[in-house]
From Swiss-Prot:
SUPFAM superfamilies from the UniProt entry: a domain/subunit of cytochrome bc1 complex (Ubiquinol-cytochrome c reductase), Transmembrane di-heme cytochromes
Protein name as it appears in the record: Cytochrome b
Cofactor annotation comment: Binds 2 heme b groups non-covalently.
Annotated compartments: Mitochondrion inner membrane
Biological processes, Gene Ontology terms: mitochondrial electron transport, ubiquinol to cytochrome c
Amino acid sequence: MTNLRKNYPLMKIINHSFIDLPAPSNISAWWNFGSLLGMCLIIQILTGLFLAMHYTSDTLTAFSSVAHICRDVNYGWLIRNLHANGASMFFMCLFLHVGRGIYYGSYLYKETWNIGVILMLTVMATAFVGYVLPWGQMSFWGATVITNLLSAIPYIGNTLVEWIWGGFSVDKATLTRFFAFHFILPFIILALVIVHLLFLHETGSNNPTGINPNSDKIPFHPYYTIKDALGLILMLLILMSLAMFSPDMLGNPDNFTPANPLNTPPHIKPEWYFLFAYAILRSIPNKLGGVLALLASLLILLIIPLLHTSKQRSLMFRPISQIMFWLLVANLLTLTWIGGQPVEQPFIIIGQLASTLYFSLIIIFMPLAGMYEDHLLEPKFP
C-alpha cells in the first residue's frame, strides 16, 4: 500500500498534497480554514447538484420549483437549507481565512495570495447569481440594483447592462443565464483551488511566527488531518444547527414573496456577507464613484503585499500593527451593520466615516505602524 501511495502517479499527487506534505509544527487553528473552505465547496457543489435536478430556471416556475423542492422532494427542505446556509458558512470561513492571511503576513506568497483574491471575487460572483435564482422579491430587486451599477461605466454602460440582462429589464433571459453561471462557476472555483494549492505547495505553509519553519517540519497526516477533522466537525455542527433549527435566520423575509417588477421592497439589501461592500458603495453619493469604491474595497487586497513595510512578516510580535488590524476588523463589522440599515442619518455619516477609515487603515496606518515598529527595534548605541 505504501508503494502504491508513493509510486502510482495519481496517488503520488494526493500523497504529496495531503499525506506526506511537510507542514510547520506550530501552525494554529487559524490554518484550519483552508480545509474548511474545501469542505464548504464540496458541500455546496453536492447540494447544488441535487437542487439543480428539481429547479427550473423560468420566471413563471422558478419560485414554485423552489417551493416544490421544499415540500415534495425527499429531504429537499434539508438540501435547500444546507445550500443556503452553507453559503453563509463559506463566507464566514473565507473572511477568517483572509483575515488570518493579513494578520500572519501570508500575503507575501504573492501568487498564492493573488489567486486567493481572484477566488474570493469568483465566490462572491457565484453567490450573487445564486441569490437571484429563487426569484423572490429580494432576488429580483437585488439583481436589478446590482447589475444596474454597470450603467455607471462611461459610454458603454447602458449597452453593457442590457447585454447582461438579455433585454430591457431583469427577466426570463437574465434568470436563465444566471442559472448557467451559477452552475459553471463552482467548477471554475474548483480549478482555481487546485492552482491555489499548487502555488502554496511550492513554498510550503507560513506559520504564526512568520519565520522560516524549514528546520522543524512534521508530516501533514496524521497530525493535521486529525486537527482539520476536529474543525470540520465543529463547522458541520454549526451548519446543521443553522439548517435544522433556524434556516431563515440569515435570509431576508422579502424573498418569501414572488418577484414583482411593479412593487419595490422598502429596503433593498443583499445577504449579510455583502453588506460591508454595499455600505462602501452607498457611502459615496455618486453612482460611478460608488462603483469604483466598491471595486477598490475588494481589489485593495491585491496591493496589500506592496504595502508591507515591516522587517517582520507576522503581526505576532508587533503590538501597534495588531491594534491597527483589530481596528480594521471592528471597522468591517461596523460597515456590515451600516449596510443593513436604511439610508438616513446617523447611518449615512457613520458609513462614510467607516469607509474612509477602511481605506486609510490599509493604505496609510498599517504601513506606517510597520515602519514605526522597525524604527523602535533599531539598536540605540550610546
